[in-house]
Amino acid sequence: MSENLIIFNAKVVTPLGFSARKGKEMAELRILEKATVEVVDGIITYVGPNRGEVRDGYYHHFWHYNARGKCLLPGFVDSHTHFVFGGERAEEFSWRLKGESYMSIMQRGGGIASTVQATRELSFIHLRSKAEGLLKKMTAMGITTVEGKSGYGLNRETELLQLKVMRSLNKDEGVRVDIVPTFLGAHALPDEYRERPDDYIDFLIRELLPVIQRDSLAEFCDVFCEEGVFSIEQSRRLLTAAGDYGLLPKLHADEIVPLGGAELAAELGAVSADHLLHASDAGIEAMARKGVVATLLPLTAFALKEPYARGRDMIDAGCAVALATDLNPGSCFSGSIPLTFALACIHMQLTVEEAITALTLNGAAALNRADSIGSIEVGKKGDFVVLDSDNYHILPYYVGMNCVNTTIKGGMLYPSV
């Protein structure tokens, strides 16, 4: 559903462009005081100075919104999440606090394996209800587009079920966020294929990719390219096959060790490589050359007490950097956009302006959507965030506190209270 809307007396704060902003470009924002934004049928048709027609009644067939000088930003794009899952893993959080590593928990049957079991046990209705509840919490923080991954089924039935849940939610007009589905069947090895990773990759290629293409269930294929999970060669083979079925490549890359995932992402022309805590200088440079978006997930590093990805170095090397929450039931049960802003600026040394670009236009680019969302420009969707202030610097300054007053999706207003 979309509406006709006129927003006036706004302080527009937005990156510009229809592709990712790289390097120094990330700090460049357009700022318009006392601005009007016009939305017709959910699409932006005017951005500029306040217009007298608002006072003269020209817009009588529009909803009117007086921003009263507050900042109007593009809707936030959360380009990496795992929001469709069963169960929780709160006890594992306590284990990590006592010093146990994420990988050691996985090796003794916890981690992803425990979520896989819980997800396989849920019906479509229960899985959908849980996912919808999480989305409502996320949209209150200004998220208007969210990526969601499968990867907690690791079998034919439940991987497809996760993707069908996302499709169902995407068609529901009551769900006020656009969902971009990603197939992450190569998230871990299921017990059925323990010690047989090559056979499992064959299974994904043979049994799942054709169905996903036939039923249009996903746009991207992702893989957990990591030591002890899927190798460079296994990841290359799956993503190459996925491309033959029309899925664009993404990678969980260099999260735990410097395996060379960033280099593989550049080799394959991936849309994005994500995590990148241990990406090499050569990998960063290769991603910058090939235009691979570096999607950084500071909440996960925070929750795991790991070193943060080198966001400042990546931007200085000419990369396009995006930020996302990585909401998931294990390593990061958080969809907090406010805390993402704060951690990125404090620990990754992004400026506020760069962080805004990373969570809007570059997040859109990480989902192959920079032509339609991510900035406030004519021709793009009417997706916005109204802050509680005329000062956008509050985004990281209000550490972990939601400063979104209103979310606007397709020209429809949703107060955050």
Swiss-Prot record:
Pathway: Amino-acid degradation; L-histidine degradation into L-glutamate; N-formimidoyl-L-glutamate from L-histidine: step 3/3. Its cofactor is Zn(2+); Fe(3+). GO terms for molecular function: imidazolonepropionase activity; iron ion binding; zinc ion binding. 4-imidazolone-5-propanoate binds at R89, Y152, H187, E255, S331. N-formimidoyl-L-glutamate binds at Y152, N328, G330. GO terms for biological process: L-histidine catabolic process to glutamate and formamide; L-histidine catabolic process to glutamate and formate. Zn(2+) binds at H80, H82, H252, D326. It is found in: Cytoplasm. Fe(3+) binds at H80, H82, H252, D326. Binds 1 zinc or iron ion per subunit. GO terms for cellular component: cytoplasm. It holds the Pfam family Amidohydro_1. This is Imidazolonepropionase. It comes from Bacteroides fragilis (strain YCH46). The gene is hutI.
